[in-house]
UniProtKB/Swiss-Prot annotation:
Protein name (Swiss-Prot/TrEMBL): DNA nucleotidylexotransferase
Organism whose genome encodes this protein: Bos taurus
Keywords: Magnesium, Metal-binding, Nucleotidyltransferase, Nucleus, Terminal addition, Transferase
Segments of this protein annotated with the region Mediates interaction with DNTTIP2: 151-509
This enzyme's EC code(s): 2.7.7.31
Motif Nuclear localization signal, residue numbers: 11-17
Family the UniProt entry places it in: Belongs to the DNA polymerase type-X family.
One BP term from GO: DNA modification
Length: 509
């Protein structure tokens, strides 16, 4: 039996040829006459489908609004081959063996290349062996969705907070952190890429066979996975957790303002506890470190979403008091859907004058100081140059004006039932980062400050290695055409890169 044919219990009604848009003259020149595409709306949504249809037509592809006899390729997103066939069956349509069922990644790659790319296994949608009454031995069972479509780049994978492989990703994140403490960049990247790709899997790794074909899993990584499968833990991770240097660095860097160099210094001096450090009269602390110690208990505890939203109200009230047309967007982990975090980041931009933008953060700081809400601040002035090429580094910071603060958040702002008359401390110290960017750079800044860190590293790496472009928080530059590519939204940046758009909550790589 043809694997792309659905079982029919009775005579099939002849499908009428669709008319209307599919028969109308195309609005764009068709470059590839032998390909006729139909983009399935199921699980994709009308807006995204219309966007992809228009983009594909502009690239010279023939795309039908309705499914017709002339269609040669059905393109779907987040659907298996079986789901597409089930949809066709509901429509009373029998799929020909000549009809290609493809993942949207094929269309994205083709548009990026400016021509149809070769169809490989990673593009083809897989049909379950148990789909029809007569199983076809030519089709393999799962993990179809897993291995066949996984990219080495996090920007081509959807990674939600539903992590099915915590036992492995937790281990690799500990090893990555230890590598970072030792300033071993190669090991850090190896472990972070492994953790990132495992987070994106829609199934749990239960045997080494499940790792076949998954990128970013080298021999060392696979040895650790195998040990965890067999023993329930990794001896290397266990050794790291018991390592005095790791424990000390973990403790020291938990203090706001303390980095690797200071941690190394304190460790070499023999310090192993914060109490000994704070009581040592010979040590000198920066203004940031003093604030870090002073509000340590608050800052080391997690910020809840309710607290983050309450801070958001504070920020918007202050910003809009001076710049009513400003856009204030919460970024970072909270924009990606996380329920807790260590700080709250906000991106601020305005279509108004540059002079108003430059003066905003000092005015906001002054306002909070007068209200008694400002516990600490560090204002970093902008060094942004409009026509400077994006950085070649995948981990570089941007040059926008920014302010790192610690704000006093009263409990009553989070929970109105809590009275100001309550005993004890009535507020919590919260770390807040404010970033002010020019209006025309807002899309790039939003993409960069949303994260995750691994997602941003990979989308910049992808731009460089796959598209011959340079991307950072400021701009996107096409090295081939030698032009800056403008973007009004994150969606447009993805489109420039030939990437399928990934929502913020799917960037938890």
């Amino acid at each position: 039996m043809d694997p792309l044919c659905t079982a029919s219990s009775g005579p099939r009604k002849k499908r009428p040829r669709q008319v209307g848009a599919s028969m109308a003259s195309p609005p764009h020149d068709i470059k590839f006459q032998n390909l006729v595409l139909f983009i399935l709306e199921k699980k994709m949504g009308t807006t995204r489908r219309n966007f992809l249809m228009e983009l594909a037509r502009r690239k010279g592809f023939r795309v039908e609004n309705e499914l017709s006899d002339s269609v040669t390729h059905i393109v779907a997103e987040n659907n298996s081959g079986s789901e597409v066939l089930e949809w066709l069956q509901v429509q009373n349509i029998r799929a020909s063996s000549q009809l290609e069922l493809l993942d949207v990644s094929w269309l994205i790659e083709s548009m990026g290349a400016g021509k149809p790319v070769e169809i490989t296994g990673k593009h083809q949608l897989v049909v379950r062996t148990d789909y029809s009454a007569t199983p076809n031995p030519g089709f393999q069972k799962t993990p179809p969705l897993a291995v066949k479509k996984i990219s080495q780049y996090a920007c081509q994978r959807k990674t939600t907070l539903n992590n099915y492989n915590h036992i492995f990703t937790d281990a690799f994140e500990i090893l990555a952190e230890n590598s970072e403490f030792k300033e071993n960049e190669v090991s850090y990247v190896t472990f972070m890429r492994a953790a990132s790709v495992l987070k994106s899997l829609p199934f749990t790794i239960i045997s080494m066979k499940d790792t076949e074909g998954i990128p970013c899993l080298g021999d060392k990584v696979k040895c650790i996975i195998e040990e965890i499968i067999e023993d329930g833990e990794s001896s290397e991770v266990k050794a790291v957790l018991n390592d005095e240097r790791y424990q000390s660095f973990k403790l020291f860097t938990s203090v706001f303002g303390v980095g690797l160099k200071t941690s190394e210094k304190w460790f070499r001096m023999g310090f192993r506890s914060l109490s000994k450090i704070m009581s040592d009269k010979t040590l000198k602390f920066t203004k940031m470190q003093k604030a870090g110690f002073l509000y340590y208990e608050d800052l080391v505890s997690c910020v809840t979403r309710a607290e983050a939203e309450a801070v958001g109200v504070l920020v918007k009230e202050a910003v809009w008091a001076f710049l009513p047309d400003a856009f204030v967007t919460m970024t970072g982990g909270f924009r990606r859907g996380k329920k807790i975090g260590h700080d709250v980041d906000f991106l601020i931009t305005s279509p108004g004058s540059a002079e108003d933008e430059e003066q905003l953060l000092p005015k906001v700081i002054n306002l909070w100081e007068k209200k008694g809400l400002l516990l600490y601040y560090d204002l970093v002035e902008s060094t942004f140059e409009k026509f400077k090429l994006p950085s070649r580094q995948v981990d570089t910071l941007d040059h926008f004006q920014k302010c790192f603060l610690i704000l006093k958040l009263h409990h009553q702002r989070v929970d109105s039932s809590k009275s100001n008359q309550q005993e004890g401390k009535t507020w919590k110290a919260i770390r807040v980062d404010l970033v002010m960017c020019p209006y025309e750079n807002r899309a790039f800044a939003l993409l960069g400050w949303t994260g995750s860190r691994q997602f941003e590293r990979d989308i910049r790496r992808y731009a460089t290695h796959e598209r011959k472009m340079m991307l950072d928080n400021h701009a996107l530059y096409d090295k081939t055409k030698r032009v800056f590519l403008k973007a009004e939204s994150e969606e447009e940046i993805f489109a420039h890169l030939g990437l399928d758009y990934i929502e913020p909550w799917e960037r938890n790589a």
